[in-house]
């Protein structure tokens, strides 16, 4: 286990180096018409949804390390296929999207379960601290990769994917130096595994934690969808690409800082307080994007607030995972996290379909703000009264761990 802890943080940094993040849409548009670019995105999201839960079950059944090795190998292949693509290479780009989706699906939940299993009996606050450091390094890596990715666009866009292939290969090599964490129980057959996860949901704290994260996936993604138009309103067509790249870099740096605050916030305000503060911040951000449509000065405010769009997720990640994984059996940790992610993606898809009913961006953002406020009220209701955020409940099944 010492080898795992020795190489884990360098691995998480390398795994976060996706240099193509700020330029991938432009990269696609340079090779394909917009309609086919949207088809590529649909292929990616469909593959992620299809692989999300099976990859979690695979991790619980076969092992954490093999699952992460598959993830990194898929990312290497994906990046090389992207780099090799040329104008009109839809099939090659679609294959690259499939491998990219597999890479992210096989990482989802398994990285957290790997660290939690490695720490074994010492998990808890130690896991929370290490997960916070891991998350912080991941955001720092994303910030650095975004800055270099923008430079790659000027020099040679394919370089961003070649650098990503190299970093993913390096992460793969570090995984080879690690060992599979010992577990006394393996995952059951798929249907039985699903029944066990649903049984875990009978714990009031578990379903509240899962529901909160799934709902926040929706709220976190709204700024990603509507930030680009706000940046365009502020900087114009000519500079929107550069502005978006700089904005991404600073947003990731702030998220890295917030990730390190997670354990402190939890110890100071309790888990309920930390999650509610995260919900409140995102609600204010979504409301500011709506107000930005009406007033130019609010566009500046919204863009400034959007620098912190990843901070709530970063701050809540370690406390939330520590609380949830401590209540889940070792044979279904990755499956539960995958189900949580799948639920969030499904809710976000339904939200997009709902917003599409209104063709005007102003109306869409008004509805999104309304949904954010409703979720905030539900969070206050189910995570604890606003005046008693730090209160520790008496019954484990009815109260969130503080």
What do the predicted segments below correspond to?
Residues 1-2, 178-211, 400:
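Juxtamembrane intracellular "pre-TM" segments in multi-pass secondary transporters
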Residues 1-50, 205-250:
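Helix-loop boundary and gating motifs at the non-cytosolic
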Residues 13, 78, 89-107, 299-315:
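Hydrophobic core of transmembrane alpha-helices in multi-pass small-molecule transporters
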Residues 50-87:
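Conserved MFS/SLC helix-loop-helix module at the cytosolic interface between two early adjacent transmembrane helices
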Residues 73-88, 281-295:
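C-terminal ends and interior cores of transmembrane alpha-helices
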Residues 98-139:
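Cytoplasmic helix-loop-helix junction between adjacent transmembrane helices
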Residues 117, 164-189, 383-395:
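Helix-loop junctions on the cytosolic side of multi-pass membrane transporters
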Residues 272-316:
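C-terminal transmembrane helical hairpin of 12-TM major facilitator-type secondary transporters
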